[in-house]
UniProtKB/Swiss-Prot annotation:
Location relative to the cell: Cell inner membrane
InterPro entries: Membr_insert_YidC, Membr_insert_YidC_N, YidC/ALB3/OXA1/COX18, YidC/Oxa/ALB_C, YidC_ALB_C, YidC_periplasmic_sf
Principal location class: membrane
Protein name (record): Membrane protein insertase YidC
Subunit-structure text: Interacts with the Sec translocase complex via SecD. Specifically interacts with transmembrane segments of nascent integral membrane proteins during membrane integration.
């Protein structure tokens, strides 16, 4: 580089530095507004170009993956509602499916609106297999149309897949009830689709809606009715993941303690194949919110729907979103859908179905207080069982009248229980007493006792109903909250359970006044009520209140019956019968021989002979 070039470059550098230095120190006379006006369009154009490029790329990707369904992958979400006196069903053009279901006449434990179905905690998909990628029909966008069919409301969602091919979802809701009819149709596809069933996958993160979240968690499961094996359900309290693969199923139901969401084929059809799953307690579904306070369990039902029915337009299904009410579920046109309401074992279920529920519903139609209804129910049951109670009391009174003879036997034989029992049987025979006559009436009352044990925990009518300090008769009454947890008892005090325990102890004391039971067995009868105090502390307040009232009525009944039974006169009658039997007097016919007593005598004689034989061997 020569001398002139060096000088030229140096001058240019000095001039440029001076220019930039001067410009940077100048204050503009007016605010600079030009740059935003110039640069904004540039930024907007950039964004638009990027957006257009993204849309183009997305459309191209959708076209490659979904073919004719690509156009339906984009759209605008719009809501439609189906409403009757019981439910509000919200539908969306995004997916052409159910967005939420509100039960109008029920509320959560904290008095909020009860949404039995919400998209936030329900993952619902309907997979259609195509020659390209499987398509989730509930991810497409549809056009919605509202219409009427008599007193029924109808919403139809339809999307165009090109070349005359359409997918159509139709939802119908009657003027009342909790059932939503659902029709699915795929038209114009001809033989383009592979002959594979559609898969409806329903995953629910069960939300807490009951006060007692532990009982609600235990009672949440998947119920189903199979054509061959009948009704069954996944283990409710299992700590492991429970899964069953089923065939020919009438319906599946994601059941909670007092409500259920079900799916079934209309007109008596069956689901060819289904897989149901109950996830462990406190578990969550994939992509579901994790909140142990809000969500209590995770359930899933995956059903296979024949493609042929969808293509032919004969795919007629239905959803049920409602209470576990026996009468309501019985009216659902699905095979034995009332099985979602647990009424107990066969005999107990029969009593609840044909006796308890009709009587309870009848009382409910007359009285508004459920406390009063329970009291009247107790009185009616005790009135029906009065003959059995009277017979049981008289039998115990007879046994007590023989106490002098029985005491003599104990003094005579000491600790030789076998000898005592043998002679006791002879005494009973002489006096014409069947020692089991007092037990049989009690045993006959057991089915009713068990019926109540199954009825009250599952009676949705008691849900949210208050009585005195109990705010919800379907849950335990928390009279006091303990600052600690007692093993097998809990951290709360149920006053109705405490009253039930005290009344049971009182009844036991009254009953022991006419009982011949002595020794450890007598004191054991006082231990059982204490056990029930622990067992029933977390059971529904309605059940504990029923047992409490039942005990009070039974005590009063015992005291009244005692006034009409003259124990002295009863003793004279027994002695007369003994004298008659010992004299061989058969006037009026020989006494009937009790087969059971005869068998007991024979068994005791055989046992005595065996023991005598063993003693003889030892002596040798």
């Amino acid at each position: 580089m020569d001398k002139n070039q060096i000088i030229g470059i140096s001058l240019i550098s000095v001039l440029m530095l001076g220019y930039f230095g001067f410009m940077s120190t100048q204050t503009p006379e007016t605010p600079v507004t030009t740059p935003p006006a110039i640069t904004q369009p540039v930024q907007s154009d950039t964004v638009l170009l990027k957006s257009a490029a993204t849309d183009t790329a997305l459309k191209a990707q959708n076209q490659r993956e979904y073919g004719d369904f690509a156009a339906a992958m984009v759209g605008e979400a719009k809501e439609y509602k189906l409403e009757n006196k019981d439910v509000v069903v919200t539908l969306s053009t995004k997916g052409g499916t159910i967005k939420s279901v509100l039960l109008k006449n029920y509320f959560t434990w904290d008095k909020k609106q009860l949404f039995l179905f919400k998209q936030e905690n329900n993952q619902l998909s309907l997979i259609l297999n195509t020659n390209k990628k499987p398509v989730d029909l509930y991810s497409l966008y549809y056009a919605g149309v509202e219409s009427k069919a008599g007193d029924k409301q109808v919403v139809t969602f339809k999307t165009d897949a090109g070349n005359g091919k359409t997918i159509e979802h139709t939802y119908t809701l009657g003027a009342a009830g909790f059932t939503v009819d659902y029709n699915l149709k795929a038209a114009g596809f001809g033989g383009e689709l592979p002959n594979l069933p559609l898969t409806l996958d329903w995953r629910e993160q069960v939300e807490r809606i009951e006060y007692d979240s532990e009982q609600a968690r235990v009672k949440s499961t998947v119920n189903y009715m199979a054509a061959e094996d009948g009704f069954d359900y996944l283990s409710e309290a299992s700590k492991d993941r429970e899964t069953e693969t089923l065939s020919n199923v009438y319906w599946v139901s994601l059941k909670q303690k007092f409500f259920n969401s079900g799916f079934y084929i209309r007109e008596g059809g069956t689901i060819p194949s289904a897989t149901v799953t109950a996830y462990p307690m406190y578990s969550t579904l994939p992509n579901a919110p994790v909140n142990s306070e809000k969500f209590i369990k995770a359930l899933e039902a995956q059903v296979q729907l024949p493609l042929e029915a969808v293509i032919s337009g004969k795919a007629a299904y239905a959803f049920y979103f409602g209470p576990n009410d026996f009468k309501i579920c019985k009216a659902v046109p699905a095979e034995n859908y009332q099985k979602n309401v647990n009424l107990g074992w066969p005999l107990v279920s029969w009593i609840n179905r044909f006796v308890v529920i009709p009587v309870f519903d009848g009382l409910k139609g007359v009285f508004s207080s459920f406390g009063l209804i329970i009291v009247i129910l107790v009185l009616l049951i005790k009135l029906v069982l009065l003959p059995l109670s009277y017979k049981s009391f008289v039998s115990m009174a007879k046994m007590k009248a023989l106490k002098p003879e029985l005491d003599e036997l104990k003094a005579k034989h000491g600790d030789d229980q076998q000898a005592i029992q043998m002679e006791q049987m002879q005494v009973y025979k002489q006096f014409g007493i069947n020692p089991l006559s007092g037990c049989i009436p009690v045993l006959l009352q057991m089915p009713i006792l068990l019926a109540m044990f199954n009825f009250f925990p599952n009676a949705i009518d008691l849900r949210g109903e208050s009585l005195w300090w109990a705010t919800d008769l379907s849950s335990y009454d928390e009279f006091a909250k303990l600052p600690f947890t007692i093993p097998f008892y809990g951290s709360h005090v149920s006053m109705f359970t405490l009253l039930m325990t005290i009344s049971t102890l009182a009844y036991t004391w009254v009953n022991n006044q006419v009982s011949t039971v002595t020794g450890p067995m007598k004191y054991m009868s006082y231990a059982m009520p204490v056990v029930f105090l622990f067992v029933l502390n977390s059971f529904p307040a309605g059940l504990s209140f029923y047992y409490f009232v039942s005990n009070l009525v039974t005590i009063a009944q015992q005291l009244i019956i005692r006034r009409f039974v003259d124990e002295g006169q009863l003793r004279l009658q027994l002695e007369a019968k003994r004298d008659k039997n010992l004299s061989g007097d058969t006037t009026g016919g020989a006494p009937k021989k009790n087969r059971f007593m005869a068998r007991m005598e024979e068994a005791m004689k055989q046992r005595e002979q065996e023991q005598q034989f063993k003693k003889n061997i030892k002596k040798k």
